[in-house]
Amino acid sequence: MNRLKEKYTKEVVPALMSKFNYKSIMQVPKIEKIVINMGVGDAVQNPKALDSAVEELTLIAGQRPVVTRAKKSIAGFRLRQGMPIGAKVTLRGERMYEFLDKLISVSLPRVRDFRGVSKKAFDGRGNYTLGIKEQLIFPEIDYDKVNKVRGMDIVIVTTANTDEEARELLTLLGMPFQK
């Protein structure tokens, strides 16, 4: 069993049960999935840019991403409907816990001038969104092979009903929030 999942079942669940007075263990919020999305704006002019983004995302997530396509045509961006413009990957189960563990303990501390992640990035429904400016913070990415610094969005979807519950869940799992 993954280190973070073990921590969740042994420490986090009892702590949340006592703090929020849940009647049943099934009411305790848990992490449902993590979605990593990488928008590649250059893919319009340069289709090769998408291939490297897909490769990097595969290394980071440990599974193959889905290529996302444009929903509508936008003339200002020279964009046609159905053109590939990004990649996303949805992690669940073991891979999700492995990725979150790696993100919290290895990758986030490697961010330049890191003072903790924002407390305001909850969406009101108990989900947390985190923007990352460069993919180099992940240990799997080789600095020499990177042709362009790309950012990504990481969305942590939880079963929590309120932001407060979700914040408590992530704090107990070790997410470094700003003081």
Curated annotation (Swiss-Prot):
Subunit: Part of the 50S ribosomal subunit; part of the 5S rRNA/L5/L18/L25 subcomplex. Contacts the 5S rRNA and the P site tRNA. Forms a bridge to the 30S subunit in the 70S ribosome.
Function: This is one of the proteins that bind and probably mediate the attachment of the 5S RNA into the large ribosomal subunit, where it forms part of the central protuberance. In the 70S ribosome it contacts protein S13 of the 30S subunit (bridge B1b), connecting the 2 subunits; this bridge is implicated in subunit movement. Contacts the P site tRNA; the 5S rRNA and some of its associated proteins might help stabilize positioning of ribosome-bound tRNAs.
Coiled coil segments of this chain: none
UniProt-listed GO biological process terms: translation
Family, similarity comment: Belongs to the universal ribosomal protein uL5 family.
GO cellular component entries: ribonucleoprotein complex; ribosome
MF terms (GO), sorted A to Z: rRNA binding; structural constituent of ribosome; tRNA binding
UniProt protein name: Large ribosomal subunit protein uL5
Organism of derivation: Geobacillus thermodenitrificans (strain NG80-2)
InterPro entries: Ribosomal_uL5, Ribosomal_uL5_bac-type, Ribosomal_uL5_C, Ribosomal_uL5_CS, Ribosomal_uL5_dom_sf, Ribosomal_uL5_N
UniProt keyword terms in alphabetical order: Ribonucleoprotein, Ribosomal protein, RNA-binding, rRNA-binding, tRNA-binding
